[in-house]
Each structure stands twice: as structure tokens, then as C-alpha cells.
Amino acid sequence: MTIPTTVSVAPADEYPADGHTMTDKLTATLDKAGVRAISTDLWGIFFEDISYSGDGGLNADLVQNGAFEYNRADSIDWSNYSFWRKIVPAGSFAAFDVLTDNPVAEENPHYASVEVEQAPASLENIGWDGMVFRAGETYDFSAWMRISSNCEASALPVTVALIDDDGNAIAEQDITVDSNDWRKQEVSLTVSGESNAIVVHEGALRLTFTTEGTVDLDFVTLEPRTTYNGLKHFRPDLVKALADLQPRFMRFPGGCITHGLGMDNMYHWDRTIGDVEHRPHNFNLWRYH
């Protein structure tokens, strides 16, 4: 049996913000011979973004608010710099701003702008109650960066470092921002050792701006390279724990993420595909982002 149907399709570079969807044709072929009854007694799992089950949980990214989209309108305790520390040592001078002109993605327009008049100065992300680092693990860092249009420098160095419980760097790499256009910077940092034992319980990611100038940055991420069966961007120990349950089905989305506070805040599957930069950030009723 062939059933012509219409599905909503959103290309990676085009996401309707008004709730309307674009359409494309999809033809599905169903084989009656393959139909079988479904048991009414199945063991399954249910996903709702509560108790940090999404970001801070299954999501392997250790950075919280890496897109600088947290804001007071979503939660009275939030700001665009929530979970970031601004570090300006004695003798240094720097200003930290949040801008929206010419962003990486219109869907998530806010980005940080760090103007350093007397170096050094740093931004430090503490993740979810601190970052856990393991011996022998490699952590992949990425961020979109550019030299601000009001800065005359042609190249600005930035040091990326993993910070331990005592505030010391246990791995670091230097990158160079050398364009007035947004470019994705990527670097890997490996913690010494081979045991995979936890060596840092309340660590952080530190970005240090070592010369005078202004750098814009957005979509900062840090992920451990270890995966479960090659499944990237998911925390391997939690995925394994779910797989060990041997569920026959998964309910998603579940709970109040389904309806949210209204049409604009409810779960829209078509806004969760494509490049992550173009997926609109949102908050939920459990006060997660």
C-alpha cells in the first residue's frame, strides 16, 4: 500500500519563526505482511527535561549557557552571563558586553563581546555545579569567534584551558582569532594520565584573552571524546544505563515540555533539526533552558 502524505521540512538555514511550516512531498510504502500486533505490556522509558536530564545530563556538552541566551525574561535568576565568571586580575582592565548585531544565527542572536584594554582577562564557565575531568580523556572545544569590527587588530590570541579544583590549568591550547567574520574555532585538550579516573570534580573551562583588543564569541562547547557505541554528543555512562534497561519504547517528548507555557514555548520538533546554531533556544516549566 502506497500512501502519499505531506510532512513539514525545515532546511538547516531556514527556520520559520511564526509557527508556519514549509512542506515537501514524502511517499511511504507499508508492507501488510510485516504488520504484527504490539503487546500491551511493554517496558519503556520516558524523557522529560527535569533534574537536568537533557542539558547537564544526556547532552555531553560540559558548558552551560554557551550561547549566552539565558535571560531574565525566562527566569529572574538568569542573565546572559549566567554560569560564566569574569576574571580581571589586578592591573588589568576589561569590559564584558552582550550584543546582538550581526550574530552567528538570527535564531539565537546574543553573543559575548570582550574588550580588553589592559591584558590579560578571562571568561570562565563552571558548567553544571562544576566540570568533571578524567585522566586520559580528550575534550573537544569549539566556539564561534571574530575580531570586533571596532578593533584594529589583525590577530588576537586566546588561551583555552581546563581548570582544576584549585584553579590551576591541567590542559591548555592557544588559538588565534584573525578575522572580522565569524569563524568556528576548534581545539582538543587532553588530561594527563591513563586511568580514566576522575581527577577534577569542580573544574571549569577558561578562555584567556592575552592581548589588547575586542573579541566576540558565541556557541562555546566542550565535550569529552569518549562515546557509547560511537553516539556523539551524548554522555556515554547515561546512554549505557538507559540501554541496559532494554526498553522496548521511549516516550518523547513527555510531561509539560509537550505543551509548555503556550504555542511559542511548547516543543516543536522541526526546530530541533539542522545545525545547532540555528535551533532556537527555549526555556521550560522546570526552569531549565
Per-range role (PLM):
Residues 2-289:
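Extracellular and organelle-lumenal recognition/adhesion modules and their flexible linkers in secreted
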